[in-house]
Amino acid sequence: MKTILIFTQEYLHSKQPPAGGTGSFYKKYTSSLLEKGYKVVIFGNSSVALNGQDGNLRICFLKRNYFKKHFIQELFRSLGKRLKIAALEAYFLKKEVKDLTNKLKEFLKKENIRPDIIETHDWNGISLFLDELSIPYVVRAHGCYKILNKYFGYNITLGLSLIESEALKKAPHLVCVSKNSQQMYEETFGKTGTIITNGVDCSHKPISSDTIPFSVFFFGTAMLKKGFDTALNVFNRLRKRFPEATLHIVGRNYEVYLRETHLEEIKNVVNYGFLDGDELKEVLQKASVFIFPSRGETFGLALCEAMALGKAVVAADLPSFRDIITHKEDGFIAKNEDEYYEYIAALFEEASLNKSISEKAQKTIEHQYNFEKTVKNSLAYYQKIINTK
């Protein structure tokens, strides 16, 4: 196995739109594959075109404008969406996916690239026609819209739900990022995935950064689905007991949240916005305690990143978080606002408890959720597929 192709609509790159979890994962994954000597091809579409070569990395993002070029199809797709006619909307969404797959075929032929395997994400159903390339492919369950809708209440159109279902039921190889993820995909699509847990980079050296006493860090997008309202409520209670307490937001959307909820600026809140790389690690290492009150996750990557830095965490009572945290050993699971308040207050007041929880959290990630293990297990899975094709 020499060449791995990643078929994606999201990738963390300075010349691409801001990336979420999928794009960040593939950036980190690609870097690790290149370090191991593999050739990596990134192909997909997004709102910004990108074409380039850097050593063993080939990137080609086409501009996503299929429906702008086919406005009659867009008219019928929109009609199907508005009238909730799933088959009509899905029919034209499939045409877009088919067009992208055909462009991938043309790209591979033109550049004489022969991937040994293709990896792609589960959302938007973009794997639907990959079987036509006669190249083994793997779908990694980053969290498709149908799953997010069913379990966490996210919005999804009927047509998109239909093509995601069709694509996943058709996929010969599915990677799930946790036991909880595996269960959700099996219940929804009748397909049992292979568990390869996500992980974080544990090889970095700590960046010197003093801990801010009585600081609560919220690491993620400031929105209701991430439980930001809970974080604010808990913080306001903590501030009455600990007047010097501060809430630190590392992620997007804080100003938008304030506008949408008609809230004024809150005292003792520090908003860093979106951070990445060493700057992110430097800021996160200032935390005394992390709060993760999300209402739904297929995996807790941000949670793992905080624990990997040797920080105490208090997280929502979600199956995906319970997969990672052993309650009261390497973190805390909170079932309501009272418990968030009690656990964070205890971590503020008892330095020995905070230290013990933090040290055990770091060991948990190093042993079980190390990104190097994610890469190693993924490559072994690829090879197994290739050997049996």
Can you annotate each of these PLM segments?
Residues 259-278:
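Nucleotide-activated donor-binding/catalytic signature segment of Leloir-type glycosyltransferases, i.e.
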Residues 219, 232, 246-259, 273:
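Glycosyltransferase donor-sugar binding loop
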Residues 327-338, 346-352:
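Conserved acidic donor-binding segment of nucleotide-sugar-dependent glycosyltransferases
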Residues 208-226, 232-235, 248:
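Conserved donor-binding/catalytic core segment of Leloir-type glycosyltransferases
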Residues 312-315:
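Short hydrophobic beta-strand element within catalytic cores of glycosyltransferases
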Residues 29, 155-174:
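Membrane-proximal helix-turn-helix segments that form the acceptor-binding/catalytic region
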Residues 295:
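Aromatic "clamp/platform" in nucleotide-sugar-dependent glycosyltransferases that forms part
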Residues 180, 199:
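Carbohydrate-associated surface elements
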